[in-house]
Curated annotation (Swiss-Prot):
Belongs to the uroporphyrinogen decarboxylase family. This is Uroporphyrinogen decarboxylase. Gene3D superfamilies: 3.20.20.210. The record marks D77 as: Transition state stabilizer. It is found in: Cytoplasm. Its main location: cytoplasm. Keywords: Cytoplasm, Decarboxylase, Lyase, Porphyrin biosynthesis. Its EC number is 4.1.1.37. Substrate binds at R27, Q28, A29, G30, R31, D77, Y151, S203, H317. It catalyses: uroporphyrinogen III + 4 H(+) = coproporphyrinogen III + 4 CO2. The keyword GTP-binding does not apply. Pathway: Porphyrin-containing compound metabolism; protoporphyrin-IX biosynthesis; coproporphyrinogen-III from 5-aminolevulinate: step 4/4. SUPFAM superfamilies: UROD/MetE-like.
Length: 338
């Protein structure tokens, strides 16, 4: 689909408000929905779900059908890239991803098999786009190279990032370069198969000091965006360097992202004053899950602050699994009517 014809893509490309504030939520498809739990009840392997074209199509469309979201985001995971590179990726219920730690860039496969390996996901993108109303965006995505690298070196999620931050700098840089190369190919394929917006999730960006943030987040992101825009000149790309703090400003100014998603720790007045591109965010998902009254109150405050800007309503991170569906419905109804 030609980018720019959907509501969210228009807001990003025109860099101006689009009337009603649109809404979609990170992790809007997933465990918070009873229809999701039913659809995957006989599936024991999360990666098998991600490579099942028909199931991915169904899961991607579920929140759009239930809540009338303004965008669908393809149901997948940022560790697809790790799997493509030959890492042993498993998801353990209640724990998260468990990966055999990578100790050298020589352990990683090349990009030759990426289209073949990810074809079930790409075909799901094509199917979703064909079933999605034309005014609704289809968001493709990948993890930021730093974040994917931290997962495969740490062997999963981490609170300290002690292994990756003490990794040989030259080896870490090569691993990030390899991930960047594959990510470029993967995202371009997602666009070719029908995604009309892309989001880069650098979930672990906040673990880095300013010099390392520039080397491991800004530079790889810039390379990805230049490669995409060399093929698709004004394609809308949202960056999400979670917990970057004041470095959000450098990220917006130096990477070339079309828009930025801000986490819930970013003061909205600071964001409005310092981030001069379309904004997305930033309701605390804990409020949405556990305090509907406060969530609605805070959502109104966010909209009041940003409604005169090009703005997309979202959370400051993903929907929590135990978020009541009635809370999500109330939020969507509020944003669409406020």
């Amino acid at each position: 689909m030609e980018s720019g014809k959907t509501t969210i893509a228009k807001i990003i490309k025109r860099n101006e408000p689009g009337g009603r504030v649109p809404i979609w939520l990170m992790r809007q498809a997933g465990r918070s929905l009873p229809e999701y739990r039913k659809a995957v009840e006989n599936m024991n392997n999360f990666m098998e779900i991600c490579y099942n074209t028909d199931l991915v199509t169904e899961l991607t469309l579920q929140p759009v059908t239930r809540f009338d979201m303004d965008a669908a985001i393809i149901f997948s995971d940022i560790l697809i890239i790790a799997d493509v590179l030959g890492c042993d990726v498993n998801f353990v219920r209640g724990v998260g991803p468990i990966i055999k730690p990578v100790e050298s860039p020589k352990e990683l496969k090349g990009p030759q098999e990426i289209e073949t390996k990810t074809l079930p996901i790409l075909n799901a993108i094509k199917k979703v786009r064909s079933q999605l109303p034309k005014e609704k965006s289809l968001i493709g995505f990948a993890g930021g190279p730093w974040t994917v690298a931290s997962y495969i070196i740490e062997g999963g999620s981490s609170k300290t990032f002690s292994k990756v931050l003490n990794f040989y700098p030259s080896c870490l840089k090569e691993i990030i370069e390899r991930i960047t190369e594959v990510t470029i190919i993967y995202l371009i394929k997602q666009i070719e198969f029908g995604a009309d917006v892309i989001q880069l999730f650098d979930s672990n960006a906040g673990a880095l000091s300013e010099p390392l943030f520039k080397e491991y987040v800004i530079e790889p992101t810039k390379r990805i965006i230049l490669a995409i825009k060399d093929r698709f000149s004004d394609f809308p790309i949202i960056g999400f360097p979670r917990s970057a703090g004041n470095l959000y400003k450098d990220y917006c100014e130096q990477t070339g992202v079309s828009a930025v998603s801000i986490d819930y720790n970013v003061p909205i007045k600071w964001a409005k004053a310092n981030l001069n591109i379309p904004l997305q965010g930033n309701l605390d998902p804990n409020l949405l899950a556990y305090n509907k009254t406060e969530a609605i109150k805070e959502a109104k405050r966010i909209i009041d602050c940003f409604r005169d800007l090009p703005f997309i309503f979202n959370l400051g991170h993903g929907v929590l699994p135990d978020t009541p569906v009635e809370n999500i419905a109330a939020l969507v109804n509020l944003v669409k009517s406020y």
